[in-house]
Amino acid sequence: MPLNCSSLATKVPHTLGGLKTTATTTTIHVGGGGFFNLFSKTHQNNSLYIASLSLNKRNSSQRYCLSSSSSSSFVMEDTKDMVFSTLEPGKYSKELDIAVRAVQMACFLCQKVQESLISKTTSQLQAKDDNSPVTIADWSVQATVSWILSETLGSRNVAIIAEEDVQTLSKADSAGLLEAVVQTVNDCLAEAPRFGLKAPGTSLGSSEVLEAISRCNSTGGPNGRFWALDPVDGTLGFVRGDQYAVALALIEDGEVVLGVLGCPNYPMRKEWLSYHHRYHRIISKLTPPTSESWDKGCVIYTRRGSGEAWMQPLIQGHKKLVWPNSATPVKVSTIENPALATFCEPVEKANSSHSFTAGLAHSVGLRKQPLRVYSMVKYAAIARGDAEIFMKFARAGYKEKIWDHAAGVIIIQEAGGVVTDAGGRPLDFSKGMYLEGLDRGIIACAGAKLHEKITRAVDASWNSSSL
């Protein structure tokens, strides 16, 4: 679903790909300077091969969207190569436009931080109360996305529920950590014009970064609208150099209305999902991707009622984001036979019962080995058609959080799939930060028929399980 324009003024004429139109633009010039100097100074010898994407300007089916006005936060670049999006403007168009740009920026930030974690040290890693890891990227992404949403939509109009808080960063002995987060945020925001967003007039200070993080204090609920953000979903995968995701969803009156899922390490070749991402990095270094190839990394997005989900590559190198950034539609698989299906489950046994899902897989005739993937990348795999089933049955006492599922659920649904609890009921995002009333676990499938077969098998197997 190529993103569409929230507004178009009619003052300055332009010719776009043979199509005459008019628009008022605000041009923002990007200055020079290093990006992520905090890390680049100590990692100058570590080359990171990232595929870049060349736009096929001769492809008449590509449509580029302009969102511009005299007071717009967006940038219109290279207008001679742009034509209008074919998608009709609709509800939540502006919000989706901003959300995708914000997630693109967040993924760009994460790639830099992950490279430094893999290359040098884990000193940037902290532990939360539940012993799950949290990194500079978690806080930096949360601050960056919070700042972007507040600046573009107005702070009074933005409520965010998110995973991280400022308790650790606010401690007296965390001055070095806070300084690193502030620098990472500012380095990222300085690149905002490349993503079609306005950079801050001056660098943010520590208090402003802490405020942006702490602004994510919504408690959710059944009324009004709020954003659900998981800045780095699958932090363990992130620090291990494997799969992780940046997830952002808008929830209105208890219903998810748009979702954006950034998957920086998602390989474009399905078979690579079966390998730890370090093998992918090794191969990329041995045979670097060409400028025409799209090797890894994507953002998948949708909005409620569109009946479609779209995927675009991450922008690489020093390229600028130009809508729709070679976006392509994604659809779930048509496989209905469990014997032919690929089954996803969490990597960590602490997050889900592998023994129950293994027994269930055997009972329905699943022949393939389960695909164990960190984070909401599992939702992306189903939406893309690379897998057909995702089941998660948490151990007793564990409560699912809405930011771990909201974006992935709507993306699968609009791509043609089905997501419910084990009782066949839709997931309820109206009860605050947790998915309250969840019947046993979560089942996501590529289609209704396959979903029905799996839920029946769960019912048949549940009583014999010690879960």
Predicted features by range, described:
Residues P2-C107, E115, Y275-D295, L314-N325, ...:
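Oxyanion/phosphate-interacting regions
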Residues Q104, F108-S132:
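N-terminal capping segment at the start of a domain
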Residues A106, C110, D138, L149, ...:
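Residue-level signal for inorganic ion chemistry
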Residues S123-R225:
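N-terminal assembly/interaction segments in proteins that build large macromolecular machines
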Residues L169-P193, W310, P324-S326, E336-L340, ...:
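Multi-pass membrane proteins that catalyze or facilitate reactions on polyprenyl-/lipid-phosphate substrates
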Residues S207-E211, P222-K296, R303:
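DPxDG-like acidic metal-binding loop motif
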Residues G307-P313:
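Short polybasic amphipathic segments
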